[in-house]
């Protein structure tokens, strides 16, 4: 092996969901929204001055940060915006998980967590779920270098009640606790209210699922101003202009159209509940989904044996 080859950082990469080029398929593999984004996005596109594209975008994403903060009743300095929640989470791992102690996250969860930990050389321990696929809060009461978990979890779609989320935070006030809420709009109560109660909490959300804008790559998180400043310092050390002008403009329109947002989320929740009822009638079993997908199995799967080659 050549010397330069020995110095290559090698990781097992995350495998993104397939994005087929054909249009005549029912695509379910990445939990995208079946409804288009608010029509106000098209209006924003028509208003856009193409000459503006010759200029760099606002590095601080000021207008979008303000729109998000106003919508959720937070201060601007409590909001960080990134290129999708994956970018936000990655920045969080790099910024806050620098201890020799392992970070903790569920063993059945978002598979990107272990990829980031390996990439940034962060030690970690995966905590098992219980027999019903629930996160066990007590497993996170031990010494660690940080905690991250989705709520609702993926791929189980199970929501953990806010009092249990707070129990985990109470037992980990010396480290940063990240609550990944990519699917929170489809069920359950956000941990956002805990941001003003605990200085070590970050709540991460995304435009990709409930706001129908996976193609725009907009993610954000809430935290105390000191955490948000640290995230911005790290972001600006990578690239000052991460969010493009189009995403900023479309994101603002999406946040401001509350009526359309709630209408689409309501349709998806209704469809999910109908699907759960029909799947039960067909003999499927599944945890009680609070996301926009269902983690289902069927007893007949246990009876099938693949033929010998």
Residue ranges and their predicted role:
Residues 60, 200-280, 284-287:
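PLP-dependent aminotransferase class I/II
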Residues 53-172, 183-198, 202:
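Conserved core of the PLP fold type I
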Residues 287-293:
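Short Gly/Ser/Thr- and Asp/Glu-enriched loop/turn motifs at secondary-structure junctions
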Residues 179-180:
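Hydrophobic residues in beta-strands of the RecA-like P-loop NTPase core, especially within AAA+ ATPase
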Residues 1-55, 143:
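N-terminal "arm"/small-domain region of PLP-dependent enzymes with the aminotransferase-like
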Residues 299-301:
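Helix N-cap motif at beta-to-alpha junctions
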Residues 222, 295-297:
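Short hydrophobic/aromatic beta-strand micro-patches
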Residues 304-309:
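Conserved small/polar residues in nucleotide/adenosyl-binding loops
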């Amino acid at each position: 092996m050549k010397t330069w080859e020995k110095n290559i950082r090698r990781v097992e990469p995350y495998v993104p969901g397939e994005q087929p080029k054909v249009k005549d398929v029912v695509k379910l593999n990445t939990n995208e929204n079946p409804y288009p984004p608010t029509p106000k996005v098209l209006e924003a596109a028509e208003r856009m001055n193409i000459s503006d594209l010759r200029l760099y975008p606002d590095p601080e994403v000021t207008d979008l940060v303000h729109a998000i903060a106003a919508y959720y009743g937070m201060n601007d300095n409590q909001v960080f915006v990134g290129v999708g929640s994956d970018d936000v989470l990655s920045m969080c791992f790099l910024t806050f998980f620098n201890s020799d102690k392992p970070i903790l996250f569920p063993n059945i969860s978002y598979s990107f967590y272990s990829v980031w930990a390996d990439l940034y050389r962060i030690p970690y321990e995966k905590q098992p779920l219980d027999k019903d696929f629930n996160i066990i809060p007590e497993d996170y009461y031990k010494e660690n270098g940080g905690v991250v978990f989705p709520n609702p979890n993926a791929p189980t779609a199970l929501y953990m009640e806010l009092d249990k989320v707070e129990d985990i935070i109470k037992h980990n006030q010396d480290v940063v606790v990240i609550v990944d809420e990519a699917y929170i709009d489809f069920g359950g109560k956000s941990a956002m209210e805990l941001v003003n109660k605990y200085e070590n909490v970050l709540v991460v959300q995304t435009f990709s699922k409930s706001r129908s804008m996976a193609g725009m790559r907009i993610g954000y998180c809430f935290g105390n101003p000191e955490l948000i400043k640290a995230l911005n310092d790290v972001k600006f050390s990578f690239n000052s202009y991460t969010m493009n002008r189009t995403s900023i403009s479309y994101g603002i329109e999406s946040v401001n159209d509350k009526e359309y947002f709630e209408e689409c989320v309501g349709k998806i929740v209704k469809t999910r509940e109908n699907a759960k009822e029909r799947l039960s009638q067909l003999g499927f079993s599944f945890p009680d989904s609070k996301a926009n997908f269902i983690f289902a199995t069927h007893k007949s799967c246990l009876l099938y044996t693949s033929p010998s080659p």
